[in-house]
């Protein structure tokens, strides 16, 4: 069973109390109902009521009505003649929230008494209020909207809006405000969201004038602001919309909008801006809309939009833009609407819209675009999502095949109000999504090239948007292209110009004159105009020559030629040039010819000669200017082989002017060439790098031990830079030079011949250059000659020499007399005109008794072994026969004074010919000779010319001389065969030949009166050695002559020191001159020089 609710169970208990309360209420109700729930007060006179709104506007009221109902929430007193407000009239309006007092004659902000506290919106526009008094606003504690526009307020001070106000929207537009004090709105910083200051007289905004962190909209349009300084709007952290249109702003300094990181919309239209740069837009990272129309913008700097990468809509209409360069719109990847209408754009660079991947609407109406559509391809590359393109009202006369390349997503294309005359085949074919194509032209050239267009338009259902009428040929003029039969589109002529001569790319040097030539042909008589473009911009004041002539082959075709002259070209003339030839039927564009202006390189830094020490760093500078910028290259000694490069000690920076070589070495020394080269030419400059090094010895000197009479050499191979000067010292003093001391060039080799005991000592090689001096030493030790004569007194030597000479002379003359008598018995002398040479007389004896050339070969052996020998008491140096084979190539003479007849102590030389034969040199007596004893390392090998075995016993002297010439070849050798012989050491003894010769000549002349078989001494002074043997020629003469010659020769052959000359043959017996001389003879032979 359910329990009863509490109300039911408790009803009996509450009934008395409830009844008592109801009784009291009924007793008091009549009084309170009369006071509060009486009848509603009527509307004020001359006002209308609508709900809780009381409308008293437009009544011409000069004073407030007295019967304003208390229930009024919205009171409209606008459009009256109120000049003052009686606050008492608002005493009972406790519900009042909106008060409209606009369009009256109030001169100050009125006070509404107690009702001011609840007023939320106060409209005071179009009055005559002169100022804003902060004290008058203190009572409006609930005020959120205050409209003071269209009054006569001239200034806003910091005291105008005291703290504590809750104004959210403040309108001060259309006043006369010219002074805007910094911090004037600080009292509203906590509440103000919208501030309108448009249509005032503000000329300058103070920096940080607005410290309103909650403000979202700021309207400053139609003022007189000329410049926006940086940080002007700092403090407006929440600003979203800024209106600055219709001012006189000509420049935005860098950071002008810094701090507006949340701003979405910026209005700058109708100002005087001339350019767009990134610095002025710095900080607008959240900007979505930028309105820049109706300015004077003529250029957009590179990266001008780099801080507006979230921009969705950009309005640049009604400006002075003439071209869109490749990077004019870079980094606007989020842009969806771009309006560029009503500019003067005539050139759109290829790739100008590259990167605008989000762009959907592109407005290019009312520009001067022609070539972009007629000639350029790829201008719209990158607009993959573009859906609408408007080119209404441009100067397009033809549409190229690839004009709209890259617009595959295009849906709306407007080409209206263009005098289009031709459209190339498939110009719109790639626009698969095209839904609207607007064309309106009455100038179409209806030839065979337009035949494709009508069926294509009808196939895509686009003919409704196209108004196209033929203008040529005359038969189709005025007809719509859709009504012309396909067979009527023919090409009987070519009224549109056709290029036949293209301008050519060229290169020029600064200051030269250049010209470009371009020719076209046309069958039309329509006037032709010529223009030249440079980098796709028309040259306004081009220096042109234009010609026209009738083509020879057909008189109906005209050829037109235009020549562009560029005089005294500079760098500013560089670019791509193109000619445009136009008539009524269209324009023809030539290829683009590039002009490159070059300047020969010239040095700004020239390398200089330097001299540095080894181990340091060499620094060579070289820099040059030119156009294009020259490339710098280095060479060493005309090549690219750098020792420093191989060793990684060379450093050349690509962008630096300095060439470094570290840890410099001698190998780095040379001439370094800096070459600056560009397409105009090249120039070079040389610098010599001299490496300085202290002297040093490359090969150390060694101590030497030699024997008396030998030759010793000291080699001092010095290195250093500059080349060291070498000086030889002995015992610390300058070396005393004699004829035995010889030097090679540079004194690096010192040779001492025939050394003597006095030559022993310490030899010093002193090497010096400007960097220092170095010394090297060598000790020379001299050993006495074994087996040769000992040191003795001069008197003893002289005595022994005299005795030996007398003995030898006697023995020699005994042999001579014996041989002479023996020969005289064997041969008889006939008194004929011919001289008969005995059969056993060798051919080197002439018919006139003179000694003819003996065919001898002298072989010098380098480095041969030294033969042992000793000197007998008679002064003859005997050799060991065991050391002399048949061909003696290693014979060595003893170091005995040499006697060469016909020579004085003057030195004599040998000149070696190119074929290794020796040429005789003259001595003091102008005769050639060979020393009687052989020098070291030299062997003499006689090679007598064999006598023809078939030769008859008698022969004429002419035949003998002919026979001698035939068997006298010059054999290669390293000595002399013509009587010249190189001394191995020592000087020559003095000769008495000058005294012997005249005596012998006289004797011979007196004895040979008839000239027959006489001993001619004309060549006596050229004999190498005096062979002390009987002469065959003397033997054949008279005994008196022979005896005189013997006595005279024996007397004069003594030298001044008392010694007789050494016999040429060291053997005890003489060998007769007959037959053929064999090679077994080991003694020296008589060497007779050639006559």
From Swiss-Prot:
It is a single-pass type I membrane protein. Glycans are attached at residues 76, 152, 248, 294, 320, 385, 686. GO terms for biological process: hair cycle process; innervation; otolith morphogenesis; sensory perception of sound. Residues 497-596, 601-690, 695-781 form the Ig-like C2-type domain. Disruption phenotype: Mutant mice are born at the expected Mendelian rate and initially display no visible phenotype. One to four months after birth, they develop skin abnormalities including alopecia and epidermal hyperplasia that are reminiscent of psoriasis. Detected in brain (at protein level). Predominantly expressed in the brain, restricted to a small subset of glial cells, such as Bergmann glial cells of the cerebellum and glial cells in the nerve fiber layer of the olfactory bulb. Expressed also in the skin. Low expression is detected in the thymus and heart. No expression in the kidney, liver, lung or small intestine. Its main location: membrane. The chain crosses the membrane at residues 797-817. LRR repeats lie at residues 71-92, 95-116, 118-139, 142-163, 166-187, 191-212, 214-235, 238-259, 262-283, 286-307, 310-331, 334-355, 358-380, 385-406, 409-430. Disulfide bonds join 47-56, 446-470, 448-491, 518-579, 622-674, 716-765. Residues 35-70 form the LRRNT domain. Residues 442-493 form the LRRCT domain. Contains LRR and Ig-domains that can mediate low-affinity interaction with EGFR. The LRRs and the Ig-domains are each sufficient for EGFR/ERBB1 binding. This interaction is abolished only when both the LRRs and the Ig-domains are deleted. This is Leucine-rich repeats and immunoglobulin-like domains protein 1. It comes from Mus musculus.
């Amino acid at each position: 069973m359910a329990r009863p609710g509490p109300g039911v169970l408790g009803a009996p208990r509450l009934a008395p109390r409830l009844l008592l309360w109801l009784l009291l209420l009924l007793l008091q109700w009549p009084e309170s109902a009369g006071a509060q729930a009486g009848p509603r007060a009527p509307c004020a006179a001359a006002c209308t009521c609508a709900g809780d709104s009381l409308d008293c506007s437009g009544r011409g009221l000069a004073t407030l009505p007295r019967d304003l109902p208390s229930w009024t929430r919205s009171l409209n007193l606008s459009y009256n003649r109120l000049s003052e407000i009686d606050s008492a009239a608002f005493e009972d309006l406790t519900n009042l929230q909106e008060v409209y007092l606009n369009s009256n004659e109030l001169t100050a902000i009125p006070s509404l008494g107690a009702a001011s506290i609840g007023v939320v919106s106060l409209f005071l526009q179009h009055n005559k209020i002169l100022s804003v008094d902060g004290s008058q606003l203190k009572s409006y504690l609930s005020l959120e909207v205050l409209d003071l526009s269209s009054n006569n307020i001239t200034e806003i001070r910091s005291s105008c809006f005291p703290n504590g106000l809750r104004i959210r929207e403040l309108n001060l537009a259309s006043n006369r405000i010219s002074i805007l004090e910094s911090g004037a709105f600080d009292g509203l910083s906590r509440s103000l969201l919208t501030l309108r200051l448009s249509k005032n007289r503000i000329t300058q905004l103070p920096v940080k004038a607005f410290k309103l962190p909650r403000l979202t909209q700021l309207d400053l349009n139609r003022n007189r602001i000329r410049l926006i300084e940086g940080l002007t709007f700092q403090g407006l952290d929440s600003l979203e919309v800024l209106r600055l249109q219709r001012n006189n702003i000509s420049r935005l300094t860098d950071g002008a909008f810094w701090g507006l990181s949340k701003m979405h919309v910026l209005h700058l239209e109708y100002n005087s801006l001339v350019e767009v740069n990134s610095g002025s837009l710095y900080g607008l990272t959240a900007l979505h809309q930028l309105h820049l129309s109706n300015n004077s913008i003529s250029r957009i700097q590179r990266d001008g939009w780099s801080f507006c990468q979230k921009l969705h809509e950009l309005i640049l209409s009604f400006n002075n833009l003439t071209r869109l360069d490749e990077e004019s719109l870079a980094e606007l990847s989020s842009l969806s609407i771009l309006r560029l209408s009503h500019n003067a754009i005539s050139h759109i660079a290829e790739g100008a819209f590259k990167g605008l991947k989000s762009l959907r609407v592109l407005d290019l109406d009312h520009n001067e675009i022609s070539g972009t559509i007629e000639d350029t391809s790829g201008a719209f590359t990158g607009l993959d999502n573009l859906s609408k393109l408007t080119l209404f009202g441009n100067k397009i006369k033809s549409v190229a095949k690839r004009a709209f390349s890259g617009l595959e997503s295009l849906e709306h294309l407007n080409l209206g109000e263009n005098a289009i005359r031709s459209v190339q085949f498939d110009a719109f074919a790639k626009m698969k999504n095209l839904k609207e194509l607007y064309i309106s032209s009455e100038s179409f050239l209806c030839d065979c090239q337009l035949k494709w267009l009508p069926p294509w338009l009808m196939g895509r259902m686009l003919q409704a948007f196209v108004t196209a009428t033929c203008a040529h040929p005359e038969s189709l003029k005025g007809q719509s292209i859709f009504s012309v039969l396909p067979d009527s589109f023919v090409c009987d002529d070519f009224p549109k110009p056709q290029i036949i001569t293209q301008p050519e790319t060229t290169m020029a040097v600064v200051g030269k004159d250049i010209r470009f030539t371009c020719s076209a042909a046309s069958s039309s008589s329509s006037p032709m105009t010529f223009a030249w473009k440079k980098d796709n911009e028309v040259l306004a004041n081009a220096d042109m020559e234009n010609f026209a002539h009738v083509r020879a082959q057909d008189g109906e075709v005209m050829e037109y030629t235009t020549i562009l002259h560029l005089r005294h070209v500079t760098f500013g003339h560089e670019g791509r040039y193109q000619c445009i030839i136009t008539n009524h039927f269209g324009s023809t564009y030539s290829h683009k010819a590039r002009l490159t202006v070059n300047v020969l390189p010239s040095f700004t830094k020239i390398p200089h000669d330097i001299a540095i020490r080894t181990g340091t760093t060499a620094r060579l500078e070289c820099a040059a200017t030119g156009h294009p910028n020259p490339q710098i290259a280095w060479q060493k000694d005309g090549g690219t082989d750098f020792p420093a490069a191989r060793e990684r000690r060379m450093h050349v920076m690509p962008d630096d002017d300095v060439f470094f070589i570290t840890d410099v070495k001698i190998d780095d020394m040379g001439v370094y060439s800096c070459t600056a080269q560009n397409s105009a030419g090249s120039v070079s400059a040389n610098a010599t790098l001299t490496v300085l090094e202290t002297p040093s010895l490359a090969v150390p000197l060694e101590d030497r031990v030699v024997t008396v009479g030998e030759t010793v050499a000291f080699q001092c191979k010095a290195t250093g830079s500059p080349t060291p000067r070498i000086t030889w010292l002995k015992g610390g003093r300058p070396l005393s030079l004699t004829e035995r001391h010889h030097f090679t060039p540079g004194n690096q080799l010192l040779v001492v011949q025939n050394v003597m005991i006095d030559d022993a000592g310490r030899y010093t090689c002193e090497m010096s250059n400007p960097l220092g001096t170095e010394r090297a030493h060598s000790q020379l030790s001299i050993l006495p000659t074994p087996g040769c004569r000992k040191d003795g007194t001069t008197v003893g030597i002289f005595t022994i020499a005299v005795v030996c000479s007398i003995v030898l002379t006697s023995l020699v003359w005994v042999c001579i007399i014996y041989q002479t008598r023996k020969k005289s018995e064997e041969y008889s002398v006939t008194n004929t005109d011919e001289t008969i040479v005995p059969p056993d007389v060798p051919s080197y004896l002439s018919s006139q008794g003179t000694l003819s050339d003996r065919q001898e070969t002298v072989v010098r052996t380098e480095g041969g072994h030294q033969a042992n020998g000793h000197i007998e008491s008679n002064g003859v140096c005997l050799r060991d026969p065991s050391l002399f084979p048949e061909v003696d190539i290693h014979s060595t003479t003893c170091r005995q004074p040499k006697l060469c007849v016909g020579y004085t102590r003057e030195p004599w030389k040998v000149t070696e010919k190119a074929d290794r034969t020796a040429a005789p040199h003259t001595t003091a007596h102008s005769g050639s000779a060979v020393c009687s004893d052989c020098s070291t390392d030299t062997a003499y090998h006689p090679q007598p010319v064999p006598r023809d075995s078939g030769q008859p016993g008698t022969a004429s002297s002419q035949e003998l001389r002919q026979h001698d010439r035939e068997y006298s070849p010059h054999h290669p050798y390293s000595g002399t065969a013509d009587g010249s012989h190189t001394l191995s050491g020592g000087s020559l003894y003095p000769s008495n030949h000058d005294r012997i010769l005249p005596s012998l000549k006289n004797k011979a002349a007196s004895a040979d009166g008839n000239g027959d078989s006489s001993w001619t001494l004309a060549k006596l002074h050229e004999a190498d050695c005096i062979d002390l043997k009987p002469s065959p020629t003397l033997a054949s003469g008279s005994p008196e002559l022979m005896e005189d010659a013997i006595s005279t020769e024996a007397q004069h052959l003594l030298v001044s020191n008392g010694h007789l000359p050494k016999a040429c043959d060291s053997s005890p017996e003489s060998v007769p001159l007959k037959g053929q001389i064999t090679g077994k003879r080991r003694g020296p032979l008589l060497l007779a020089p050639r006559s």
